[in-house]
């Protein structure tokens, strides 16, 4: 009988992850608790976007392997898999057509623009959906504890010039 506990999220909750997709996009994710994340997008189509208190679903797939999934107010769906032991990350992002057509509309601190994001989403168009399916390399994995509001507390362009190297000290 297996002793694997698929409900044990202690290996991912409280982790701050920085990763670079194979396409060059840089992201940052903080697993704030078992149902909430904060994140920053450093580069790529929606670079300089950041979000706090995004509701998510977190599951444990295997030892040191977790999946985090959510739907954003923009209508974008995201599913991420993190293999912490091998520092391998995989993300699938389902962008509605309106985001692909006008990504700059989402480049903001989303929490201050929730009504606006909902209006954009409702106006659409939603289809055809653009699927971004990419592997990434985890460059920083650090334990910062649960519900730490200081982990992601400013836009990417206000971080130290040596980010994320400054985290490795």
Per-range role (PLM):
Residues 23-27, 49-54, 74-80, 88-90:
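Short, surface-exposed coil-to-beta transition loops
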Residues 22, 40-42, 71, 94:
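Surface loops and adjacent helix of pleckstrin homology
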């Amino acid at each position: 009988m297996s002793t694997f506990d698929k409900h044990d999220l202690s290996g991912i909750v409280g982790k701050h992850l920085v990763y670079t997709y194979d396409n060059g996009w840089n992201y940052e994710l903080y697993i704030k608790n078992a149902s909430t994340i904060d994140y920053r997008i450093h580069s790529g189509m929606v670079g300089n976007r950041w979000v706090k208190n995004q509701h998510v679903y977190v599951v444990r797939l295997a030892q040191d392997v977790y999946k985090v999934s959510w739907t954003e107010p923009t209508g974008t769906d995201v599913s991420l898999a993190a293999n912490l032991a091998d520092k391998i990350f995989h993300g699938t992002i389902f962008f509605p057509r309106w985001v692909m057509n006008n990504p700059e509309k989402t480049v903001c601190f989303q929490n201050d623009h929730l009504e606006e994001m909902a209006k954009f989403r409702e106006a659409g168009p939603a289809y055809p959906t653009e699927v971004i399916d990419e592997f990434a390399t985890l460059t920083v994995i650090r334990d910062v504890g649960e519900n730490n509001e200081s982990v992601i507390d400013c836009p990417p362009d206000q971080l130290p010039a040596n980010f994320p190297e400054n985290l490795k000290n």
